Amino acid sequence: MIEGLKTRKYDIAFCSKMGNEPSIEFIPVAKQDLVLIVPNQHPLSTRNEIDLADTLPYPHVGFSKRSGIRPTIDKLFLECGGMPQMAYEVEEDQAVAGLVAAGFGIAVVPHMPILAYMPVQIIRIARPTWERIFYMCTLKDVYQAPVINEFKGYVRQKAKILLKT
């Protein structure tokens, strides 16, 4: 997404915040918690909440290094004292959830509506605590058409409401 902004393929992108991007304006617009998902018959499936350290013995399905959320999840695991064994790495949230549903491992993912329709158990992460912020991203210091600026203003207004809850 960020690369698409830089090449002017996109006027606006919605994604996680990336470090070391001085030419990009990141405006927070929504938040989302991270959860652990496990297959329905997994030994952890009866848990309501979990310390991420308790997940380290199990194979994980993770996000690839190209994913914006990967550094955040890695940081959470380092806070817990270790990194999980990655059975598979993919880029998209839904692909991670699909591999977990098929029994290929467990995963830390954003809490998203599709999880309710998949054969996985959703477990709240008690430690470490964290929430994901989504950003509206645009290039700084470039001309933007009036319609783009109007859309940015609309999103900012809606974001104020979303971020209060």
Kindly label every feature range from the protein language model.
Residues 1-38, 96, 100-104, 120-125:
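Short beta-strand-centered segments that line the small-molecule binding cleft or hinge
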Residues 59-80, 144-152, 159-163:
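Secondary-structure junction motif
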Residues 16-17, 83-92:
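Short beta-strand-to-loop elements that line the ligand-binding cleft
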Residues 21-60, 145-146:
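Flexible hinge/capping segments at coil-to-helix
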Residues 35-37, 43, 106, 133-137:
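Residues embedded in well-ordered beta-strands
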Residues 122-164:
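A late-sequence structural motif
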Residues 39, 63-64, 86, 109-110:
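Thr-Gly-centered strand-to-loop micro-motif
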